[in-house]
Regions:
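Extracytoplasmic loops and strand-loop junctions of Gram-negative outer membrane beta-barrel proteins
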Residues: 41-44, 82-84, 136-141, 172-175
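Cleavable N-terminal export/targeting peptides
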Residues: 1-33
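Short glycine/proline- and aromatic-enriched beta-strand/turn motifs that initiate or cap beta-hairpins
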Residues: 25-75, 193-195
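Gram-negative (and chloroplast) outer-membrane scaffold detector with strong preference
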Residues: 61-136, 165, 194-196
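Membrane-embedded beta-strands of outer-membrane beta-barrel proteins
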Residues: 58-62, 97-101, 153-155, 159, ...
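Surface-exposed extracellular loop regions of Gram-negative outer-membrane beta-barrel proteins
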Residues: 151-171
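Outer-membrane beta-barrel "beta-signal"
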Residues: 35, 98, 184-196
Length: 196
């Protein structure tokens, strides 16, 4: 009797565990489904180490799924880079708003791993050297802080961890106009998206 009871309990526990561990694709990529995405990024700077110094970025965006697994997004990003000048660094900070569209390029049969490509329009403010014109060696910085605008191309690999949580690895190339520094700014990022 005791053995029979423990077998029933064990069977019920295994059934419950399997029910919650097996994916149910019915709740994935539904039109009008929304999500919130949080990412950390690293700008790719020529001649610099990938994770060098204070070069980093963070972003948060809202996603809205359309038909056929594609989605739109609205996001804000902050990115900081250090540009070497003699023996010290000049900080370049960007605060950007992005509006874009992502289209599925490739996926596995169960829609667990998806490869997306997309485009976005962006605009924001770029601050250079915390608005200080005079550098520590007495030189005057001719570049200035200003509003910037442009577009970006995106590529991402999105992996469903659960039906509502995705792990993301993204690459983007931003084209910024109105800037005095670099017009093309590539970056890589990783993060999570929570669909609801």
């Amino acid at each position: 009797m005791v053995m029979k009871k423990s077998n029933i309990i064990l069977t019920v526990c295994i059934a419950v565990a399997m029910t919650f561990s097996l994916p149910s694709q019915a709740q994935r990529l539904i039109p009008k489904q929304r999500g919130i995405e949080v990412v950390g990024s690293v700008p790719l700077i020529k001649g610099e180490k990938l994770f060098g110094g204070d070069n980093f970025g963070v972003g948060i965006s809202l996603t809205h799924y359309l038909k056929r697994e594609n989605y739109t997004f609205v996001g804000v990003e902050y990115e900081q880079q250090n540009m070497a000048y003699r023996s010290y660094n000049v900080k370049l900070k960007d605060a950007l708003l992005q509006v874009g569209y992502m289209h599925p390029v490739l996926s596995d049969r169960g829609k667990n791993v998806l490869l997306y490509g997309g485009i976005s329009a962006l605009g924001g403010y770029e601050q250079l050297n915390e608005d200080k014109k005079l550098l520590p060696d007495g030189a005057t910085l001719l570049n200035r802080s200003r509003f910037v605008y442009g577009g970006a191309v995106h590529g991402s690999v999105e992996v469903f961890l659960t039906d509502r949580v995705l792990f993301l690895v993204k690459a983007q190339g931003r084209f910024l106009f109105g800037t005095d520094v670099h017009c093309f700014r590539p970056a890589v990022s990783a993060g999570l998206r929570f669909n609801f």
